[in-house]
Amino acid sequence: MPRLCSSRSGALLLVLLLQASMEVRGWCLESSQCQDLTTESNLLACIRACKPDLSAETPVFPGNGDEQPLTENPRKYVMGHFRWDRFGRRNGSSSFGAGGAAQKREEEVAVGEGPGPRGDGAETGPREDKRSYSMEHFRWGKPVGKKRRPVKVYPNGAEDESAQAFPLEFKRELTGERLEQARGPEAQAESAAARAELEYGLVAEAEAAEKKDSGPYKMEHFRWGSPPKDKRYGGFMTSEKSQTPLVTLFKNAIIKNAHKKGQ
């Protein structure tokens, strides 16, 4: 009877061990050692036969398990499934995934740890070789200054010297004189008359401007600056003389009505 209880307890222990494992292979229970579980020796033999399978499914390091070497390189672990992963792509659902992010990180580390002189005379990295970022696409990126104008190169040396010696206005006058000389005396007379008219117009405008400055300011460029008197206030504030024909008309109508009633 005690042997039967011990065998039952052993079988129960074996069943619990088999259920605790992640996956149990079929050959362990179908082996000849696990067919007869009535005796304690057969039970222990079955447990020993199934123990390697259990340890392969759920590996446990007895004792100093923390000191055992890791199967995976911890540097390969990158949180590529998070959007703030700095080594992975922005889209976590990309074809590479976390593996591509880890590979990218390893490449960056390999580039940083590659052979090359270091110290005070170290070579500048690829990031240091890049030009400093200047916000040229913004209007406030660079200080506002005078725009560079293209330098005009003349084929003749005389024209270049004249451009440096005379300012733009004198240069225009010189070109105008050359054209007049090429046209003839009639064109010169016409241009002289046009110049005289232009000068007269400029003098007249200057005198008119002086008169305006001396007098009171009037908003003549607006339509309400100085309206005529008969159109002020919508034509209601007019003189009494303009209303006399209307008054006489009303008087005549009233007199006619009175005569008709009296008859």
Curated annotation (Swiss-Prot):
Transmembrane segments: none annotated. The modification Pyrrolidone carboxylic acid (Glu) is found at residue 173. Keywords: Acetylation, Amidation, Cleavage on pair of basic residues, Disulfide bond, Endorphin, Glycoprotein, Hormone, Phosphoprotein, Pyrrolidone carboxylic acid, Secreted, Signal, Sulfation. SMART domains: ACTH_domain (SM01363), NPP (SM01364), Op_neuropeptide (SM01365). The modification Valine amide is found at residue 144. ACTH and MSH are produced by the pituitary gland. Residues 106-129 form a propeptide. Induction: Repressed by treatment with estradiol. The keyword Phosphoprotein applies. The modification Sulfotyrosine is found at residue 200. The modification Phenylalanine amide is found at residue 87. Residues 125-134, 217-233 have a biased composition (Basic and acidic residues). GO terms for biological process: calcium-mediated signaling; cell-cell signaling; cellular pigmentation; generation of precursor metabolites and energy; glucose homeostasis; negative regulation of tumor necrosis factor production; neuropeptide signaling pathway; positive regulation of adenylate cyclase-activating G protein-coupled receptor signaling pathway. The modification N-acetylserine is found at residue 132. The modification Phosphoserine is found at residue 162. Residues 1-26 form the signal peptide. GO terms for cellular component: extracellular space; secretory granule. InterPro entries: Mcrtin_ACTH_cent (IPR013531), Melanocortin_N (IPR013593), Opioid_neuropept (IPR013532), PMOC (IPR001941), POMC-derived_peptides (IPR050878). Residues 94-134, 217-238 are annotated as: Disordered. This is Pro-opiomelanocortin. It comes from Ovis aries (Sheep).
